[in-house]
């Protein structure tokens, strides 16, 4: 089941951490073949299954992985310290450049989710590495 990323969630539960952990993080860590699905914003659903790359390093960009349930599955976590207003402006500009009109989602869902998550879980403190921009 895919959880929608367009709803309020103080723990970023919509990112489907359980699926990401079981189908991506753990198989990669143990060297097992697996597949993953990208979220396709044009249809607002998971895309087709793709083979998980067999690499030494796998980078996943997702604040919701700083959740206590997911952190044990990460070898290294990096927090890029950018203020939320700047990050939101950049994200909205990126989305507009891609033809995605997500301003309302940013304003009404994603920014409040980020604030709630940061307050509740202090991801910058949980990070192995903190990058100050």
Language model features with spans:
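Structural signal for conserved beta-strand scaffold positions within catalytic alpha/beta enzyme cores
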Residues: 3, 79, 131-132
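ATP-dependent NMP and nucleoside kinases share a basic, alpha-helical "lid"
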Residues: 45-95
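A generic structural signal for well-ordered coil/turn residues at beta-strand boundaries
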Residues: 35, 54, 74, 125-126
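Conserved nucleotide-sensing/catalytic segment adjacent to the nucleotide-binding pocket
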Residues: 1-58
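Generic structural signal for short, solvent-exposed loop/turn connectors between secondary structure elements
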Residues: 9-12, 64, 68-72, 132-133
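Small-molecule kinase domains that catalyze NTP-dependent phosphoryl transfer to phosphate-bearing small molecules
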Residues: 45, 67, 96-133
